[in-house]
Amino acid sequence: MAAAAGMMLLGLLQAGGSVLGQAMEKVTGGNLLSMLLIACAFTLSLVYLFRLAVGHLVQLPAGAKSPPYIFSPIPFLGHAIAFGKSPIEFLENAYEKYGPVFSFTMVGKTFTYLLGSDAAALLFNSKNEDLNAEDVYSRLTTPVFGKGVAYDVPNPVFLEQKKMLKSGLNIAHFKQHVSIIEKETKEYFESWGESGEKNVFEALSELIILTASHCLHGKEVRSQLNEKVAQLYADLDGGFSHAAWLLPGWLPLPSFRRRDRAHREIKDIFYKAIQKRRQSQEKIDDILQTLLDATYKDGRPLTDDEVAGMLIGLLLAGQHTSSTTSAWMGFFLARDKTLQEKCYLEQKTVCGENLPPLTYDQLKDLNLLDRCIKETLRLRPPIMIMMRMARTPQTVAGYTIPPGHQVCVSPTVNQRLKDSWVERLDFNPDRYLQDNPASGEKFAYVPFGAGRHRCIGENFAYVQIKTIWSTMLRLYEFDLIDGYFPTVNYTTMIHTPENPVIRYKRRSK
């Protein structure tokens, strides 16, 4: 096996040699030192991935049955090209052919998918020592959030950190957040004027950062947000990429350098805000103060570095959900003008004909808007795939998954399986008023995860999105441009819309 593996690696190096040589000539202008550095990085990356692949070859116990394996004639890369081009189609076709559990190889790693509610239960009910999250996500999140938080610490410590954050995401804070988000939204859209065409995903991504920073980080951090800091957040967010997931973090890639620089500069902003708050006699009831007052079970308080890392993680983890969901919902409403008008009229019915400032209690009663968000999350969940690393053999549907497999669930596939959802591809917010096969399935709808792994920011995300879209519907009418509805951009790690430009017109008062 080692000899065959060595030949495979040699073949990869030979196959990539001519392409790499041509690319290096263009990038380096023929500079010998630069070419050598790039060649070394390329070779080390292949060796790194190859070692991961070989390390995952584990024998099953006697008599155990492996999941159906989708063969690929392409060594090492496996199904990476087909999957990368159209991942949902790939998974749905595999489900039809092989059933709810199957395996395949990409970039030297073996992935086992659990599709449908029954199979997905294995992942969502698992213990971290069996299906491990850090083994999958640490190299992606640690350079972004920092060391000592999230997936860089043992799971019991991470659970304590999540509990601290969750204690700050409470109804008392949400009631404060509604007016903050409404004010930020009105101020942001002042520059849009009476009518026009705008990239709504870019706009909402910026607005989500502004509102989340104000609500979650406190006024000290929000006061420092400007175009430069917004770009730092964008560079930091760029760390969530396929390259960061697949390649070692020490490679001198431009996106890695931007990510690391942004991390240092944003941390400095947080350090100053934390010190200012610690020195202040004023006690402000917000999440920053919650973390400054929090202690671990052993009585140890959080360090400034831990507080900063947790705040960065809280913002960026939620930013993806809220910005992507908000943008997609805008296009669903623009495509269905009748539904859009119903959502606008609901504002008047619930809040009053003169549309006074929003309150948290009113927000809870906007049931149609709530169902629109829920249906958007069904068809366009921000996270396409949730993963864990198998550390122990796992049995599901009569198959045994060996240690070393990356075990995956796809919310996107689960939330549009024809066995679970009637008219599964239609955007129909009223489906939640009716009986659905999915309503009896525990893991048919999982945009925020489930079980031990459910997202702690779900309630804040709903408050944020509902407040932003309530304000936007009061300000504007939205239309598609020449009937264009965006396709999904699968080159990113979230379901972003392609060319997300929308037409708007201010409502007459």
From Swiss-Prot:
UniProt cross-references to InterPro entries, sorted A to Z: CYP450_sterol_14alpha_dmase, Cyt_P450, Cyt_P450_CS, Cyt_P450_E_grp-IV, Cyt_P450_sf
Cofactor: heme
Keyword Endoplasmic reticulum recorded: yes
Pathway in which this enzyme or protein is active: Steroid biosynthesis; zymosterol biosynthesis; zymosterol from lanosterol: step 1/6
Biological processes per GO annotation: cholesterol biosynthetic process
Post-translational modification: Ubiquitinated by MARCHF6, leading to proteasomal degradation.
Annotated GO CC locations: endoplasmic reticulum membrane
Catalytic activity, reaction form: a 14alpha-methyl steroid + 3 reduced [NADPH--hemoprotein reductase] + 3 O2 = a Delta(14) steroid + formate + 3 oxidized [NADPH--hemoprotein reductase] + 4 H2O + 4 H(+); lanosterol + 3 reduced [NADPH--hemoprotein reductase] + 3 O2 = 4,4-dimethyl-5alpha-cholesta-8,14,24-trien-3beta-ol + formate + 3 oxidized [NADPH--hemoprotein reductase] + 4 H2O + 4 H(+); 24,25-dihydrolanosterol + 3 reduced [NADPH--hemoprotein reductase] + 3 O2 = 4,4-dimethyl-8,14-cholestadien-3beta-ol + formate + 3 oxidized [NADPH--hemoprotein reductase] + 4 H2O + 4 H(+); a 14alpha-methyl steroid + reduced [NADPH--hemoprotein reductase] + O2 = a 14alpha-hydroxymethyl steroid + oxidized [NADPH--hemoprotein reductase] + H2O + H(+)
Subcellular location: Endoplasmic reticulum membrane; Microsome membrane
Molecular function terms, GO-annotated: heme binding; iron ion binding; sterol 14-demethylase activity
Reported regulation of activity: Inhibited by azalanstat. Inhibited by azole antifungal agents ketoconazole, itraconazole and fluconazole.
Disulfide-bond pairs as recorded: none
Annotated membrane topology: Single-pass membrane protein
EC number: 1.14.14.154
Superkingdom of the source species: Eukaryota
Keywords carried by this UniProt record: Cholesterol biosynthesis, Cholesterol metabolism, Endoplasmic reticulum, Heme, Iron, Lipid biosynthesis, Lipid metabolism, Membrane, Metal-binding, Microsome, Monooxygenase, Oxidoreductase, Steroid biosynthesis, Steroid metabolism, Sterol biosynthesis, Sterol metabolism, Transmembrane, Transmembrane helix, Ubl conjugation
Main subcellular location: endoplasmic reticulum
Residue positions binding heme: C455
Transmembrane segments annotated in the record for this chain: 30-50
Protein role: Sterol 14alpha-demethylase that plays a critical role in the cholesterol biosynthesis pathway, being cholesterol the major sterol component in mammalian membranes as well as a precursor for bile acid and steroid hormone synthesis.
Family of the protein in this entry: Belongs to the cytochrome P450 family.
Name the record gives this protein: Lanosterol 14-alpha demethylase
Organism: Pongo abelii (Sumatran orangutan)
